[in-house]
Amino acid sequence: MESYKPVWLKGAVILAINLIDKGYKPVAVGLGERDFYIDVKSDTSITLDEVKKAINENVLANVPIENNQIVYKGNKVSIIEDKVSISTNLNPKYFEILNISTHHPNPNEQYVRIRGVAFETEEQLKDYLTWLEKAEETDHRLIGEKLDLFSFHEEAGSGLVLFHPKGQTIRNELIAFMREINDSMGYQEVYTSHVFKTDIWKISGHYTLYRDKLIVFNMEGDEYGVKPMNCPAHILIYKSKPRTYRDLPIRFSEFGHVYRWEKKGELYGLLRVRGFVQDDGHIFLREDQLREEIKMLISKTVEVWHKFGFKDDDIKPYLSTRPDESIGSDELWEKATNALISALQESGLKFGIKEKEGAFYGPKIDFEIRDSLGRWWQLSTIQVDFNLPERFKLEYIDKDGIKKRPVMVHRAIYGSIDRFVAILLEHFKGKLPTWLSSVQVRVLPITDEVNEYAEKVLNDMRKRRIRAEIDYAGETLSKRIKNAYDQGVPYILIVGKKEASEGTVTVRARGNIEVRNVKFEKFLELLITEIGQRDVEQTTVKALK
């Protein structure tokens, strides 16, 4: 999606100008995950035909932009986008309007929101619309509703997700796996508050350079902020007592809930929210430890993505360099950048460069992952930071008794756990690996006469911490099998009189695979192994065939 966004934004700007020529009053343009949007101030609705008449009617050679606003014929249209710039080299000619809706920013105003895409060639547009049709079939928002995983409610607030029991089960499994990864690298888990005085953000630089994302409020004369990042809090834990060179590296991890004020037009299911949980980690170490630490992080990151079934060709690291707005000296930035380059080269991974896309406090390695629909998602990040230790005056006592500054490394492998859930749901089309599935086995008794045996099978699995449930014979067997398949259940156990008398089950798995006369204890043994190893494939049924 990222590669399309510059041409989409240019298309949105062109269409906004043309709408002005038609007498409409657009107030903002921006980008969503899969399209552009234009907000038009209007007391009445705008039809698709009216929008189509404005497309390509007038294309200015030079778009008049001042202070991130389109300025045209006395109108000012805000550009709600800070990562993608307007390119003079792009010339979108082929548009598709995807949706027109209305919303009310306040009780007295109505905006019409136009969503669409634009491309330079007709072939690009056709290819994208074909892809979009496939993607909509696996939209995580539809899967989430169908499987009863999560929901959003206007009463709760835009971009604030509520995870239901089955959705929370998936999150818990992801967190448990990452805890094991963290333990293998020597992390100590911490917990920090959701709210801090803004003094901490002023020291870190977030207050100035991240101000539009901060949620702040005043209480008893002090200004507080809901945390957008966990790093300053971890820094304070480091500062809570003296440290020596023998203590380093110190590795803190936290599944920390953070909040960022994303623009309403940018919100998109779990992929773009205002509150989410990061699998965050911060390492405090000596300079001589830096290269090996980064190499270990790169290796572990690749190991994690392999566990989810992504191949080497699906994993692409990028070095993101110093942005225009940043803190720290040229010398510190060069030192941090060289450390990342050295570790990447020694890892043997081919990597790309993303100019000026580093964090404001340091360069970083970003990992992009390709899903089953061919989309690339930016997930993992490793950031080297010499600047925040300087700002917070962090110290350790070196072996010669001299106080020195530690280096800080920020890292997250999933990135946002909530966003990763969305990506997995779409990647696996709702059919998650058994270890991640909220319901791993569903038992189907053929008749009520075998309910007692079915319940014994159910309880034996639950005793072994397998997430199992039973669907009694209220509907036909074929209907119940279809329901289980539609709800993404990996294994179905069918039990009748024969199975009850022999202590067996009939096992059905994805792909219409059926294995009869399976000893229940054998199935249970294989399933426990599959779940314990976190296999992506259904290895239990493969072993039974």
UniProtKB/Swiss-Prot annotation:
It catalyses: tRNA(Thr) + L-threonine + ATP = L-threonyl-tRNA(Thr) + AMP + diphosphate + H(+). It is an enzyme of class 6 (ligase). Pfam families: HGTP_anticodon, tRNA-synt_2b. Its cofactor is Zn(2+). Its EC number is 6.1.1.3. Binds 1 zinc ion per subunit. One of its GO terms (biological process) is threonyl-tRNA aminoacylation. Keywords: Aminoacyl-tRNA synthetase, ATP-binding, Cytoplasm, Ligase, Metal-binding, Nucleotide-binding, Protein biosynthesis, RNA-binding, tRNA-binding, Zinc. GO terms for molecular function: ATP binding; metal ion binding; threonine-tRNA ligase activity; tRNA binding. GO terms for cellular component: cytoplasm. InterPro entries: aa-tRNA-synt_IIb, aa-tRNA-synth_II, aa-tRNA-synth_II/BPL/LPL, Anticodon-bd, Anticodon-bd_dom_sf, Thr-tRNA-ligase_IIa, Thr/Ala-tRNA-synth_IIc_edit, ThrRS_anticodon. It is found in: Cytoplasm. Zn(2+) binds at C231, H282, H410. SUPFAM superfamilies: Class II aaRS ABD-related (SSF52954), Class II aaRS and biotin synthetases (SSF55681), ThrRS/AlaRS common domain (SSF55186). The keyword Ribonucleoprotein does not apply. It comes from the Archaea. Residues 139-433 are annotated as: Catalytic. Belongs to the class-II aminoacyl-tRNA synthetase family. HAMAP family: Thr_tRNA_synth. Homodimer. Probably interacts with its editing subunit. Catalyzes the attachment of threonine to tRNA(Thr) in a two-step reaction: L-threonine is first activated by ATP to form Thr-AMP and then transferred to the acceptor end of tRNA(Thr). Also activates L-serine and transfers it to tRNA(Thr) but cannot deacylate incorrectly charged amino acid; unlike most archaea the editing function is found in a freestanding protein. This is Threonine--tRNA ligase catalytic subunit. It comes from Saccharolobus islandicus (strain M.14.25 / Kamchatka #1). The gene is thrS-cat.
